[in-house]
Amino acid sequence: MRLSLPSIKKNILLLAAASTLFLSPSLALGAPASPDSASVASIRDKALQSDSFAYDIVEGLTTEIGPRQGGTEAEARARTWSVSKLKALGFDNVRIEEYQMPTWVRGEETASIVAPFPQKLAIAALGNSGSTGDAGLEAEIVYFPTIDDLRAAPDGSLKGKIAFVSHNMKATQDGSSYGAFGPARFVGPNIAAKKGAAAIVIRSIGTDYHRNPHTGNTNFDPGVTPIPAGALSIPDAENLERMIARGKPVRLKLKLTPKNVGMQTSGNVLAEVKGSNPELPMIVIACHLDSWDLGTGAIDDAAGCGIIGAAAKHLQSMGQPKRTVRLLWAGAEEVGIWGGRDYGEKHATEPHAFAMESDFGAGKVWGVDFRLPESASALRGQIVSALAPLGVVPRKELAGGGADVGAIIAAQKLGIIDLQQDGTKYFDLHHTPDDTIDKIDKAELRQNVAAWVATLALVANYDGELKPEAAR
């Protein structure tokens, strides 16, 4: 029988469709389906051009709450504020999960050179610093150009002295210098205490040349009595080095009077975008709600909460995703990752598949790292394609997540994507009084939201395996 041209075309289309079912496992076996690329591009571009949710969160949190150190009354007000905001944005299951934590608070802070060149220095106590007492203390400085030089000092050699540890931290796009030079703060005071030092001052872990010291947490081993520990502003640290280079003994008068106020309440704020398929393990996306007490915590980490909150809000506008997306606005990250650890303990057996975190300011996203199974290579490719118009390129490094999702990742070996932000200027502001909203670039903040929602739209609607093979 002779077929008409329309019939031939129809049969060709039917054959093509049939062959696709046989040849394409994704269609034939009902494997993961994702939103079409046009839908993802549309929501990405909408966020890039007109998102206001992220900045609104940053502005509200920094204006109406301000500094919000973990375990304090200000952090409690931040939790109340966050619940109200997340409910107003239409999220599901908004709630607070409280926990108790030991709490340290700042006191008086002064430092001055007594001899040979008397002058004041700008200083901030490090979290968990011991106290000099109200009278303060005066002692000779022993200079260590690096943390390794301090490590090499003989035991007992610092008795009655004030250790001064310097370093040469430089700005990097990926923030890698923080890991290299941060130990001066992370462990320097503990090492100095073990070697008998009466106190320690360090060059701030930062890259700016403002006379603003950078605070941050330090920790002492069990059984080690905390000694007074402070960070000098970088200009003051360099001035102190010049004094030492003149070859005369340098004496420092130091007064730091922080105190421990015992166990206090902190907590995490949780919210959700409910998924359509309860059989699929959820996604958790995180920021931290607390901040240090010197600035208003705009870049660290109100920006992160704004980014993930806005991305989840835009995701809602696409319709219900397959997977539930849980927002974790973690408490008390700065002073010991208490919120992230509490979440990991309380939700260790609740099925999760994947985690992301935003805690590196509001600089533009420039790179993307993955930790996904080989079976998710198509998803990886879709994400790379969706991010390319934003100037985001795939990197070879494996994604690692962040502090607030670290415990749940460890408990369940989750899949991870890291959206790498430009941190070139981040450590100019980190943990200083300069961490304020005027440092947020609105266009760069929107670019973050665009990258996040494009990624979330694809991951939250992917019903294949997200955990790396080694985790299963």
Describe the function of each predicted region.
Residues 34-72, 212-217, 290, 358-363, ...:
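N-terminal capping segment at the start of a domain
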Residues 72, 122-228, 296, 394:
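Extracellular/luminal Protease-associated
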Residues 40-48, 63-74, 139-144, 153, ...:
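Second-shell loop/turn segments in exported
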Residues 38-39, 115-155, 218-298, 310-313, ...:
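Soluble metallo-hydrolase cores and metallopeptidase-like ectodomains found primarily
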Residues 118-120, 139, 227-229, 237-238, ...:
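Metal-dependent peptidase/peptidase-like ectodomains
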Residues 313, 317, 427-472:
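His/Asp/Glu-rich mid-to-C-terminal helical/loop segments that flank catalytic regions of hydrolases
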Residues 50-75, 83-89, 93, 155-157, ...:
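Catalytic-core environment of secreted peptidases
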Residues 32-36, 40, 48-50, 59, ...:
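Noncatalytic luminal/extracellular "stalk/propeptide" segments of secretory-pathway proteins
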